[in-house]
Amino acid sequence: MAEEESEFLEAYAGIRTAYKAAMTQVDLAVSHEEQESPGQAIVAYELALRMIEDTFGIPVGLPNKIDTVQAEWNDACALIQKLKSAETELRYRLKVLRSQKQSIDDSAVEATEESRAEMDTKRPPLLAENPSTQYGIANASGAPKTYRELAAGLRELLAVRDAKVLLDELFRAQVKMYRIEASGSVTTISGSSTMSLVMCTVGGKWKYLSGIYFIQCSMPNEGTAGIWLYPLVPSITNCYQTEYGAFIFPDMECQQPGNAFGLMLTKEGQTSRTEDELEDLQQFFLDLLEAVLAGTVVQLKSPTSQRAGLASDTVSGSEQVSRHIVSAADFIASNLVRGAEKTGGFMLRSTPYIISKMTPASMDAQVPSSVQTSVEVAQKVTHAAAGMTGWIAGKVGTASMAVGRYLAPHIQEQGSKLLQKGFGYDTSEANSTMEGAMTIAAGAVEGVSTVFDGLETSAKILGSSLSENSVKIIEHKYGQQTGNLASGTFDTVGNVFVVSQNVNYITPKGIAKKMVKRTGEAVVSDYKRDLRKSESHYINAGSLYPDLRALKE
């Protein structure tokens, strides 16, 4: 058996052992809670969570031929998904226990005894994936609805033809739907169906459902009554997005933990839609989910992009630094950027200092007329025609690539001269140093592009800070003509942002990300390698997930 397969089997054995130990600890925590020992239960739950997190961190060697270890691979995926499901429930139980413990500390003993008796009758089944929600608290009974009660109430409401309910459809697309079993098996539920994200407004006996968001999919194979519903509840519903376009939702109504549903947006029925438009549509859906679920959408990386090991003896120091930048950006992207306004403020404060340290060009750099024309056309069209939004979205990338490719040789040439003059480097040493710096810059661009995935308010902030500050720097260094070109490019981004408010497949985040990424890629294109690819093929156990790409078509 090949070495890679042996490494995987060794990791698989470690996952099984860690899984058994973690679930034993979970059982202990549950027993403490059932015995009404909240302090001991909290400690036990916290230890169980740490054990689960340690299991997710186990390095797994990727086998070259997965068919030879298919059964073990499927079992490993199933174990990891069971742990992920358990992790969600453990965090919920910890939240409940800590809240109860705090209320006990802050209230009289007599009152706490009464509330404890009530909680015993209302407590949801432990680890049964049916948590209580905030919906229904204002009702006469005062009892919050569980997730399953919400789902059942929605189905009952939609089945009443004369119900006075307002359903606002926020999003619609064609999707393929999959069922993911706890065992790791994946089956197709619907080859193609219409999916909508809907907000419900209703009164009367259904008042507890007012304000709830839910996803519904038509099920052509199930007859007229075939509608799949999935309530979206902040802090309760978890959503995962894979990097190949699937959105995965845990099955909250199934008694067996670890089951899930997968949705993948498709172009079926809309053959005129391009891959870029489909990608923008996915991004828009992701933005909506993040807004509805208060940011609890987890990005899942596929094994091929999670290769962690780096062969340090076969790459240059600059490339190692570049790879580390990319790796770090992948890790922090989903959690890093919450204060984009601070970035804009920093740029505003730092621009005068940067300009003061730069020597302006002796003469304006000449920009090719074709580039100027493309930017001018983009400006005019974005100001005049909202119907051309899709065309402009593509032209943003074209204009930014032109700016980046024009600036690249100037950056390296001027940097090399600076090293020779200021630090006494000879020509060869200076050029080599700048080449290393550009290689690092390639990683920085890739990292910045990755981190931009996490921005929530990118276009407004970037459209302002970039146009106000980057243009000043470019104009100071390379002259008025280049500054005008950059200004026009960023103005195009601003105009497209305004137009995009009425187009559901273009988002502020997508436009800004595309602009920044393509400009940077052009600057460092000659130095950029496949920074995620390495000689080692390891991923963390927490990245294992059934691969829906096999069912994509």
Curated annotation (Swiss-Prot):
One Pfam assignment: Senescence
UniProt domain MIT: residue ranges: 15-96
InterPro entries: MIT_dom, Senescence/spartin_C, Spartin-like
Cellular component aspect of the GO annotation: early endosome; lipid droplet; mitochondrion; plasma membrane; presynaptic membrane; terminal bouton
Disruption phenotype: Mutant larvae show an overgrowth of the third-instar NMJ, with an overall bouton number and satellite bouton number increase of 40% and 90%, respectively, compared with wild type. Mutant larvae also show a decrease in the amplitude of evoked excitatory junction currents (EJCs), but normal spontaneous miniature EJCs (mEJCs) and axonal transport. Adult mutants display reduced locomotor activity and progressive vacuolization in the brain, which is associated with neurodegeneration.
Biased composition (Basic and acidic residues): 113-123
Keyword field: Cell membrane, Cell projection, Developmental protein, Endosome, Lipid droplet, Membrane, Neurodegeneration, Neurogenesis, Synapse
This protein's name: Protein spartin
Annotated ranges, domain Senescence: 325-509
Domain of life: Eukaryota
Region feature Disordered, mapped onto this chain: 105-130
Subunit structure: Interacts with Eps-15 (via C-terminal region); the interaction is required for spartin localization to the NMJ presynaptic membrane.
Expression tissues: Expressed in larval brain, ventral nerve cord and neuropil (at protein level).
Organism this protein belongs to: Drosophila melanogaster
Gene Ontology MF, one: small GTPase binding
